[in-house]
Amino acid sequence: KEVSKKICKKTKAIIGVDLYGNVCDVDELKKFGVPVIQDSAQSTGALYKDKRVGCIADLTCFSFYPTKNLSCWGDAGAVTGAEKYLKIIRQLRNHGQSDRFNINMVGWNARMDSLQAEVLLNKLPYLDGYNMRRRAIATQYNGTLHRHVEIPAQNTNSKHVYHQYVIRHPGVDQISKFLLSKGIQSRRYYPTPLHKTKTYNDMAVYSNSEYCSANALAIPVHQYLTDNDVTSIINAIKEAT
């Protein structure tokens, strides 16, 4: 509903964000008749209506930063089935060159090196298993934490990969301090909404964004956590709340 209010003649594309690994409703965004760019930086390996992210939107962008579900030293990637977008991406990543030394747009040196590509190729077969473990941990959290904090919802048609498991509670700062006292790391991601930053300053009210920024806390969720680790984290949050 909010997206429909923003569509105008100047709209060139819609960017849907798969926040924390939860796939956005791409088909709903497609209904507006403008290209959809899917920000899948946090959802590598996720599914939407049984399809992998990367083959749903007009253009999909991935991050391979070291903390991501599929990671190397920090490069990124973009995939598309449209030749016109592919041509632009290839130019942008190579100083804007359409061919060698023929520069006809502003671009960057954004080519992935072979070493990082090799690392990603070797890690790719493990991605589904890693994501499965993240979902299993999320299931453990959900089973108990829903009585103490607001737990993350999974979008309809999305198969969440839990790049982050983010709880919501009005006392997240106190919870975070208590967890740290127990040797458990947590993090307040995006404590300042985009519309309140200097660059994107907007005087309008975005109540959902402001609520999430004020009350969200990410707790550990990765494939190397043991069941005992997860139980300890659950018990610490119960004690903190």
Which ranges hold each PLM region?
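Active-site phosphate-binding strand-loop segment of PLP-dependent enzymes
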Residues: 1-72, 78-83, 218
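PLP-dependent aminotransferase class I/II
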Residues: 5, 13-17, 47, 84-241
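A conserved catalytic-core signature of glycosyltransferases
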Residues: 74-75, 115
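Conserved beta-strand and immediately adjacent loop positions that scaffold enzyme active sites
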Residues: 76-77, 164
